[in-house]
């Protein structure tokens, strides 16, 4: 029965399910920094900018259930476009490269799982990135993350 609340089915990829019936996961953009070429970010400076780069800091991390395995490999949606996670997923934040999109507003919605415009990232895709199943991705979302349930 709980699967009905998430929109996940073991029979179909999420891209074949009506998007309004699926779980989504959002966060606001909290900070924006421009870093010069050669500057590093994140734990151990694992991301080094190859050019002047705009980095958005998002208030979500592994303490919220956002897997550290998404470090350097996941993406999020901002303004309907995919932007890459750069550096390691930290306890309370992730950083994404927003150099190639329009300027952002503080608090602008960032989609971690869901749809923005014509682009989408669903739990099954996130699961593929980290070698697990969609159920684990959704069950891993921590208790610090508020839930909002909408009726159909």
Go through each PLM region and give its residues.
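Active-site anion/phosphate-binding pocket segments in diverse small-molecule metabolic enzymes
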Residues: 1-152
């Amino acid at each position: 029965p709980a699967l009905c609340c998430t929109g996940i089915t073991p029979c179909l990829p999420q891209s074949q399910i009506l998007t309004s019936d699926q779980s989504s996961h959002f966060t606001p953009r909290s900070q924006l920094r421009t870093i010069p070429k050669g500057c590093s970010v994140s734990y151990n400076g694992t991301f080094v900018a190859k050019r002047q780069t705009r980095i958005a800091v998002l208030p979500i991390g592994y303490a919220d259930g956002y897997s550290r395995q998404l470090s350097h490999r996941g993406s999020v949606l901002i303004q309907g476009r995919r932007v890459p996670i750069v550096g390691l997923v930290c306890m309370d934040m992730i950083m994404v490269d927003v150099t190639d999109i329009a300027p952002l507003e503080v608090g602008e919605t960032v989609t971690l799982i869901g749809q923005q415009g014509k682009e989408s990232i669903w739990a099954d895709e996130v699961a593929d990135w980290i070698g697990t199943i969609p159920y684990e991705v959704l069950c891993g979302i921590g208790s610090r993350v508020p839930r909002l349930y909408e009726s159909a």
